[in-house]
């Protein structure tokens, strides 16, 4: 019997997409589901950015774009990095891709050889280990749990490094936890990295603008780290442009050339119209970014307050992104008389089927004691969702 390739059979399906699909199926049946499983802003793309895209269509930006992205967009990204992050990159050190997910995948595929190790702190974004496996690498998971605010320590990093370690993947602000590494914490990690030759860090900074003011720092800022860091970012979260599919890497030119070679065979250049919209996003008025940041901060404060009022949940206050990652293990082994909760996946399914609130179990993110809720939704939805959760959890004995 014909089968799919071995490399594909090693991959797990996306748990976040599976839960979102289950939620959509229930909604199609007329069930009032509040979907807090989705990792995207609920805002519309700002009108000036949409107008820039319409202008690009009228100006006939309808042909293949250069594989690394339009020069004007790469220049706009370089200026953004200088202006906001105090990092100097040339356009030749920037590669634009079809979303930050492709940027991550390009980097892993370009740098990781068969059998080489990639250190990934857990909790992690669900796709990181799968991308490493796809590249033939070995994910090395470092547990950074609730008690340490979901952040890997330099001692843990040092202990995980072997002669076969090629890369570390670091996401700050974090999906799924909302944790943010401070400048001092990043510097301590950088000092460990710099002690080891040919060791790189993929710094996923896609949530950089969704933080408490002044919280975001880049690991590339420290002496010697620009040569070791691959920054991944994009327009999806900051500008509510998830569907436009524009991400990028900023990295040493030799790495960018390698990723460009790979991208040239996979997809070629990103969508021409999306690139012009992204260019305007970076050079235009940034007030929309601050407006959305303030909305997420208000929602964060609301959901934290309500979650802390639910007996049995333990809550760390997220400093960035738009996720709450509470500890739910106190409910394991409990039952409402029909359903028994054995793990975080059971817990999330119970909330969906009985409370009609979609979330994602922490098993998918490498932390079996917690679950993820996105608060990228209205205040009204947050209040109602937390009411439902509190009500159905009270039935577990």
Q: How would you name each of these model-derived features?
A:
Residues 2-4, 12-14, 19-22, 26-33, ...:
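PLP-dependent class I/II
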Residues 8:
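Substrate/cofactor-recognition hotspot
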Residues 61:
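Flexible nucleotide-interacting loop at or near the entrance of a catalytic core
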Residues 64-97:
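Conserved N-terminal alpha-helix of the aminotransferase class I/II PLP-enzyme fold
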